[in-house]
């Protein structure tokens, strides 16, 4: 994405009033669905809903994609992008590990 970050910035941060203005929301909604499905496979459907609410799941996923998006826009090099992406992923994965193993 780094080589196309100008397009990504337009898509995510500057698409108000276009058919793409809800792109990030769509991406987060897709992540919500796949994460909930994974939790259902791990814990069973009933327990998955007790592990984390849909609202909390959405907020955490939105924070993750927002952090990645900010990183794409602000990174000064591919190396910086990769290093910061690693930090973001490690941070969020540590939290998700708790919910995968409850």
What annotation goes with each model-predicted range?
Residues 1-12:
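Helical hydrophobic small-molecule/effector-binding pocket
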Residues 25-28, 32, 85-93:
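Hydrophobic core segments within long, regular secondary-structure runs in both alpha-
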Residues 10, 39-92, 99-101:
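Hydrophobic/aromatic-rich alpha-helical bundle segments in the mid-to-C-terminal region
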Residues 24-28, 81, 98:
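General N-terminal targeting signals
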Residues 3, 17-44, 55-62:
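Amphipathic alpha-helical packing segments from all-alpha helical-bundle domains
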């Amino acid at each position: 994405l780094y080589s196309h970050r100008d397009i990504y910035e337009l898509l995510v941060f500057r698409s108000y009033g276009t058919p793409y203005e809800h792109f990030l929301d769509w991406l987060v909604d897709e992540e919500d669905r796949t994460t909930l499905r994974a939790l259902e496979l791990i814990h069973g459907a009933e327990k998955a809903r007790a592990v984390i609410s849909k609202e909390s799941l959405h907020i955490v996923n939105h924070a993750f994609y927002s952090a990645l998006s900010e990183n794409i826009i602000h990174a000064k090099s591919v190396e910086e992008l990769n290093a910061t992406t690693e930090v973001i992923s490690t941070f969020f994965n540590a939290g998700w590990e708790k919910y995968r193993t409850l």
